[in-house]
Amino acid sequence: MQEVLNESPYNDNYGIQRMQIALSNKGIIAGIRRITRVMRENGWLHAPLRRPHGLTKATTEIQEKENLIKKDFSAEVPFTKLLTDISQIPCLDGKLYISPIMDCFSGEIVALQMRDNMRKELCVDTLKAASDRFNIKGAIIHSDRGSQYTSDAFRKAVNQAGLCQSLSSVDCCYDNARMESFFATLKKELLYRIPTTKLKMDYVKKVIFRYVFTYYNKVRIYTSNPGGMPPAAYRQHYERNCQVLAA
């Protein structure tokens, strides 16, 4: 277990289930009770430090867009259901706002933009980044009813990308619970462990990008995926299987 924890500075956040998968990947079979006992004895079990809170303010003006997700965050193929939201991080030189887009199929963060403001352009640019990187045409893009997501600019970007917009019910954070779960993970595993209020925004941006695109997407055991495959690995596994079947 110590070897697993030493593989990455983020791995010391591993819980019992992810530790069991990590050991299995190394050919070591261990039961839940044994893992629990060893992790507890060594002080390796951690509880969340804080509870995440919503950030964007909902608007009731846009009523024609319905909730197409309905708390069903599962997807059988990549890029059919996408989730997005904004979170705020206090830094030495101001507040940093992060805007990711997650693919429900694998949990992969397919786009991430960060700025010192939470204006609609932040969300529009995140959507454009996802569209430039992957073929997401035809997907549902789900968010809360914050003014950024109900703005004409964002709705225009949704239409240009060939997406279908879905909005949470007013004041119902559970309608986007999986996205909120990502923010909680990011904060627990990274942001609450570093003094962001003493660090400049540009540095915090680099740390977040490195965590998301080199660890979270590519290395971190993701228990919702078969065999705990990391998000990017699960998507690539699916794509390889499709190529084999098409050959």
Predicted segments, located by residue:
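Mobile genetic element proteins and their domesticated derivatives, centered on retroelements
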Residues: 1, 19, 35, 39, ...
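C-terminal domain-tail junction helix/linker
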Residues: 152, 159-161, 185-247
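Conserved, non-catalytic sequence blocks in retroelement Pol enzymes and Pol-derived host proteins
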Residues: 9-11, 25, 74, 91-92, ...
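Basic, flexible linker segments flanking DNA-binding modules
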Residues: 1-77, 230-239
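Active-site beta-loop-alpha junctions of metal-dependent nucleic acid enzymes
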Residues: 90, 94, 112-134
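Short, acidic, Ser/Thr-enriched surface-loop or helix-capping motifs
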Residues: 91, 103-104
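RNase H-like two-metal-ion nuclease catalytic core shared by retroviral integrases
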Residues: 55-58, 143-145, 151-154, 167-188, ...
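Short glycine-rich loop/turn motifs
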Residues: 94-100
